[in-house]
């Protein structure tokens, strides 16, 4: 079953795209452990799956760990179809909480909560690779239960929609009304359109153009 808000676009339709080995502690260990530990040593965090509580706990822990050196940037690479709002908000709040600049880089796709985290990077340090795709849309959830429960959940969803629109407006420079209109249905952006809208600050074909080389040492 698809997680609320998580989408992946491919030829022929929408499919699930999960990568449970992202952000450390890969299943089975071995080479995957070495790769993600090496990335973390370079201050790189990778979100390469739908956002859920497990990945949010890992990423927030990594952000807090890297925040021990507050003068160095942290690099968050994003290839995500979106996912849980509450899990994503845990990552978002931690990004705002720490003193470090958080450089965000979209690769592949940053959709829904993936887009939200991308746009929440430090102003001037939000990037996309040339062929990334970015999606904004309103929060969604399946509602079930008694009429009273459905009413409570619907009211909460409207509150969440309003809050997400306010924060997206803050990070993009758009008005809340504009964001609300644009996210009423799926709206896809290529990197040029995303830059014009304020979702990102620049398009980077190579790591050499990013602050600190994007954590790759290419600068």
Swiss-Prot record:
Tell me which PROSITE patterns the record gives.
CLP_PROTEASE_HIS (PS00382)
Q: Give UniProt keywords alphabetically.
A: Cytoplasm, Hydrolase, Protease, Serine protease
Q: What EC number(s) would the UniProt record show?
A: 3.4.21.92
GO biological process assignments: protein quality control for misfolded or incompletely synthesized proteins
SUPFAM superfamilies, sorted: ClpP/crotonase
Tell me what reaction this enzyme catalyses. Hydrolysis of proteins to small peptides in the presence of ATP and magnesium. alpha-casein is the usual test substrate. In the absence of ATP, only oligopeptides shorter than five residues are hydrolyzed (such as succinyl-Leu-Tyr-|-NHMec, and Leu-Tyr-Leu-|-Tyr-Trp, in which cleavage of the -Tyr-|-Leu- and -Tyr-|-Trp bonds also occurs)
InterPro entries attached to this UniProt entry: ClpP, ClpP/crotonase-like_dom_sf, ClpP/TepA, ClpP_His_AS
Q: Magnesium among the record's keywords?
A: no
Major localisation: cytoplasm
- Protease recorded as keyword: yes
Active site positions: 112 (nucleophile), 137
GO CC entries: cytoplasm; endopeptidase Clp complex
Q: Where in the cell is it found?
A: Cytoplasm
Q: What HAMAP family has UniProt attached to this entry?
A: ClpP (MF_00444)
Subunit-level organization: Fourteen ClpP subunits assemble into 2 heptameric rings which stack back to back to give a disk-like structure with a central cavity, resembling the structure of eukaryotic proteasomes.
Q: What does this protein do?
A: Cleaves peptides in various proteins in a process that requires ATP hydrolysis. Has a chymotrypsin-like activity. Plays a major role in the degradation of misfolded proteins.
Q: What is this protein called?
A: ATP-dependent Clp protease proteolytic subunit 3
Organism per entry: Streptomyces avermitilis (strain ATCC 31267 / DSM 46492 / JCM 5070 / NBRC 14893 / NCIMB 12804 / NRRL 8165 / MA-4680)
């Amino acid at each position: 079953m698809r997680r609320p808000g998580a989408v992946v676009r491919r030829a022929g339709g929408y499919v699930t795209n999960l990568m449970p080995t992202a952000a450390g502690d890969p299943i089975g260990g071995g080479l995957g452990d070495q790769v993600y530990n090496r990335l973390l040593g370079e201050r790189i965090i990778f979100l390469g799956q739908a956002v859920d509580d497990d990945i949010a706990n890992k990423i927030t822990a990594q952000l807090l760990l890297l925040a021990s050196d507050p003068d160095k940037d942290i690099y968050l690479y994003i290839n995500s179809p979106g996912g849980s709002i509450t899990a994503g908000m845990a990552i978002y709040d931690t990004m705002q909480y720490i003193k470090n600049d958080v450089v965000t880089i979209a690769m592949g796709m940053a959709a829904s909560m993936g887009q939200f985290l991308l746009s929440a990077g430090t102003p001037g340090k939000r990037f996309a690779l040339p062929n990334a795709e970015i999606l904004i849309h309103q929060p969604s959830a399946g509602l079930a239960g008694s009429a009273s429960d459905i009413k409570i959940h619907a009211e909460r969803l409207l509150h969440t929609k309003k809050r997400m629109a306010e924060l997206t407006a803050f990070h993009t420079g758009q008005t809340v009304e504009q964001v609300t209109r644009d996210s009423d249905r799926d709206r896809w952006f290529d990197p040029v359109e995303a830059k014009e809208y304020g979702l990102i600050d620049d398009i980077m074909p190579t790591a050499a153009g990013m602050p600190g080389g994007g954590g790759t040492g290419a600068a």
